[in-house]
């Protein structure tokens, strides 16, 4: 099930229509773009609601969005992934265990450690991660030099969108992880994302992106785009 972007969520909530911009257009013209948006709506007033339940349009009908998400996560793990990838039912607990460990740990992963933790081979761990990526439970980030992701070891793993974080993560206080997950979920459908190594993301083989929270400032390099929250207007590379 494809989800709503924050732009689409704002359109549903406010009744306004907003243009679609490429990542490059936002980087180059965000100071002008935001003027048009703020004439109609204050996006920050809707941001936390989107993080909690706005990705899936079912929120318009389903009040208990957490129960809905948990039900669909289980359906995906117990039926969709095993059916599409010929996984024997006896291995379902391994699949669920891997998801739980990955999403409640650091986004940087160690395949050998995961293999030992759930008791399967490294190749099986990689397969399971790719299966969950294809099922839109996870997003995998690979080295910036990688052209073909099939079968490769990811450098980082994130849940597919922040609503899933709200449903399955034990630690609800890691706001930086929420912001990173949000940004990745917005970009992955429209841009090529890679693990940067230097910063948080390498976008379209060109842009170094660093994620900050609560208006925090980065190192101020012109070559690095700073993505921060809780501000209505950015300036230059922020």
Specify the residue positions occupied by each region the protein language model found.
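Short, surface-exposed amphipathic charged segments that create phosphate/polyanion-binding patches used
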Residues: 14-17, 154-155, 237-238
């Amino acid at each position: 099930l494809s989800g709503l972007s924050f732009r689409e969520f704002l359109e549903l909530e406010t009744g306004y229509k907003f243009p679609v911009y490429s990542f490059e257009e936002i980087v180059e013209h965000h100071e002008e773009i935001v003027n048009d948006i703020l004439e109609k709506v204050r996006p920050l007033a809707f941001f936390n609601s989107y993080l909690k339940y706005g990705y899936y349009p079912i929120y318009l009908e389903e009040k208990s969005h957490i129960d809905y998400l948990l039900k669909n996560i289980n359906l995906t793990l117990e039926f969709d992934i095993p059916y599409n990838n010929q996984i024997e039912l006896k291995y379902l607990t391994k699949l669920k265990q891997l998801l739980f460990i990955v999403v409640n740990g650091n986004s940087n992963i160690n395949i050998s450690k995961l293999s030992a933790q759930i008791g399967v081979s490294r190749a099986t761990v990689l397969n399971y991660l790719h299966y969950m990526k294809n099922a839109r439970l996870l997003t995998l980030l690979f080295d910036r030099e990688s052209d073909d992701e099939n079968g490769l070891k990811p450098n980082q793993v994130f849940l597919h969108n922040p609503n899933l974080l709200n449903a399955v993560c034990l630690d609800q206080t890691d706001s930086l992880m929420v912001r990173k997950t949000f940004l990745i979920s917005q970009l992955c459908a429209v841009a090529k994302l890679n693990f940067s190594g230097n910063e948080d993301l390498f976008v379209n083989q060109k842009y170094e992106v660093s994620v900050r929270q609560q208006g925090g400032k980065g190192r101020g390099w012109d070559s690095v785009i700073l993505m921060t929250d809780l501000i209505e207007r950015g300036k230059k590379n922020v």
